[in-house]
Amino acid sequence: MFDFLPVSGQVAQDRSEVLVNDLLSADGKVIAYYIVKHNKHREYTIRDSHRNKDYLLENVENTQLNNRCFLGEDKRKKHLYFIDFQRATVDTVKNVRKFTFVSESELLVFATAENEVFIRNPYTGKQIKLFRKIIDYEFSEDNEILLLKGKIKDVILDFKSASKSEIVIHDRENCRFKKIVGSRSEAFYFLGNTADSLLVYKKEEDGLRKVFKHSLMLDKGNRIDTLFNHTALLNENNLALASLAGGIRNSSSSKAEIWRGGDNGISPRLTEKMNKAKQLLLVDMKDLKLYNFFIDGKLIDYNVNYKQQTIYEYEANEHDDYSKQFPDITLYQRSRKYNWEKKMIGRFNGSPNSVLTFNASPYLFYFLDKDWYFYDDRGKTNITGSAQAAFYNAEYVNFRNDAFIKRPVLYNKQKLLLEAVNDVYLYDLKTNKGSIFVAGSIYDRNYDIVPDNIKALNRPWMFSSDWEINGKTVLLKWNNSNYSREGLSVVGENNKLRDIVEVDGKISQVKISDNIITYVVESYNQPPALYKVDRSGKRKGLLYQSNSWDTDIRIKTEVVQWENSKGEKRKALVRSAVDLILGKKYPAIVSVYEKKVSEYHTYVSPDNVVSSGINYRNYINNGYLVIEPDIHYDESGPGVSAVKSVEEALERVEGLYPVDKENIGLTGHSFGGYETNFIISQTNRFKTAVSSAGVSDLNSFFLTVNWNTMVPDMWRMETQQWRMGTDLFSGYDKYRKNSPVNYAQNVNTPLLLIAGKSDYKINWNQSVMYFMALKKAGKQVNMLLYPGEDHELLNTENKKDASDKINSWFEYYLKNGNKPDWL
């Protein structure tokens, strides 16, 4: 049973689909998902399983779903669709510019292009209010107060008052109201400004009362930000606002862009950030006093813990350290207890995952030297010191305090869940005791908390969103060490783990409700499919099978495992046809990039055009084996480590599979491109290679600036993906030994280089440098440069062109094919 909405015309069909599991109602009875065609056309399905009815829409976004209704917007047509599940009706509201659905009050508020604002009961269709000449509208955080910003007058509606009171403001003292802050449990304040003053009004039973006025220009030369986007209440009496620097700084002269060696940062980028940076102001509405925390010439960031009435601040670029993605920060604390005076806490790593607070907790949490800590007035407490678990990726050199850690999640207000490499650790903030919550390492499992199980609170002036488990149970997704099996498990209020789903596939896009879970499963031989299951795991059903035309997938993927001479465990994926001919040898392509075993069950449509590597389906169907080894790193450096890993993998795989050793190709993109560049400079095992967007000279890359972000690439070399563990000048020999360009004379493998001429993530001149070095050395090298393309080719024609050329390159060298015309 289907309801179809009219469309303007037929959309060209393309068989390849991307499946997205979008929404699930709280009662689990309504599921919303969509598929995206190759031409970006979106087909949206809302399935009411309780009433056995499907609703089909096209190109909707900004979607909302509850137990009773669905809303979605077609922005191109300016249509708003409202589905009432009880009445089984679909209503279309046209010419909608903006909408808000207040489910608690059963009210739909929407604005039209004609500056009209309608308030309706969408279930009955009854129009409650119509306002004309309204520029915009805004709701309070709790959706109880509506501010209508008019050309002539402002109107305030209180949806929770007994009389649904309406306040009309004609005389605004040349003030335009722009912002509502607060809630019913605290207070409602209305903010606006004249040409030179900030005005704050407080809502009272009979209207608004002006409670605060202040000049926009402040005593430290800064000015109040009148957009009011960074405005919030700490409590009823403390209002947080933003200020901006009083004047615009300039890092350029009439003839030159000025870079100052003494600046903490790249001068033009620093100036741009400081001109846009907002610093915190605090207005005490009780004492009618403004606290101006502005520091001129500084890039200051803040974190406000609203419930605890605490402010943390730090100078973002104080420690000018390009060796880290997130330089250290020196953190200070302000609180009402100490009259908002600044108190230093300590120096921490500046990763947004490393330092955080929860509004429900008085503690500051931070990660330092392998362990999690919390800080309060009594000092610091180590949370995980006694845990038999690793909370960081030990493979990264000097990375114990940086980005590759997972954020803690608050659980039942008084407990903290911390994800380790395989396990989940529980710390009780009330008893200050920790324990293993889920021990994945015992069962060859790696557990992660399902994102949809986490409620994220976002407010202005926070380090990052406040993460808390939504509900009393914890849903976990797991995979085994080979990624050949994945599943879903739940930990109930009794703290007992129970498996719900286990599949030979890859699970993603998990949505949860009170009693139903929806999720997508895919495999190398099965296109993504949407399933639902109840929390007992007993009732499971297929909701939608994407790419249903793709049924004859005659390939297999296997994990090859071994121990090297040092007793270290190693792995590689081998992909092949299911019906290899006995006695026949097959050309092979080795695809490299970090760890590949996690891609075991990744589905690839044969229609996917891949320009930054290969579509393994198509190459297998064309008679190749595809080998994807895990790369492991040691102190010798990333290039040398990659050679060891690939050589070991090939020796193992060649003894198990019918590999034509005389016809093996190598390919990689980005970091895989670097690995490809280096590997062929150290071995003649490969007959040909394709490298896209790769680094060739670590020395020059260390000194390169990303022109898009205006951030130097040093951090990527020292402590991130290149894992060098030292800078260029202290470790010059190591940089030299891991730079492909230094071994151009050794390369005997024909190489195809690919880059986009707007790529500054890996500067495209790295490919040019390798091309010139190989050309100078008289080697076989060709290069494809695509104008206007970045790190990944996005233009459809360019993607197909690169994909076709890569295919013809491998056919020519590995299968004795005809020489391509473009060569």
Question: For each of these PLM feature ranges, what is it?
Answer:
Residues 1-13, 20, 695, 757:
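Bacterial Sec-dependent N-terminal signal peptides
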Residues 16-30, 54-73, 92-109, 131-151, ...:
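Conserved beta-propeller blade repeats
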Residues 37-41, 74-77, 112-115, 156-165, ...:
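Short, solvent-exposed loop/turn segments at conserved positions within beta-propeller repeat blades
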Residues 153-166, 219, 230-232, 242-290, ...:
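Predominantly five- to eight-bladed beta-propeller fold
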Residues 165-172, 212-217, 277-285, 327-338, ...:
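Beta-propeller blade signature
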Residues 278-279, 446-468, 477-489, 495-580, ...:
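Non-catalytic accessory segments flanking enzyme active sites
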Residues 584-595:
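Short beta-strand element of the alpha/beta-hydrolase
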Residues 609-823:
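Active-site-proximal cap/loop segments of hydrolase catalytic domains
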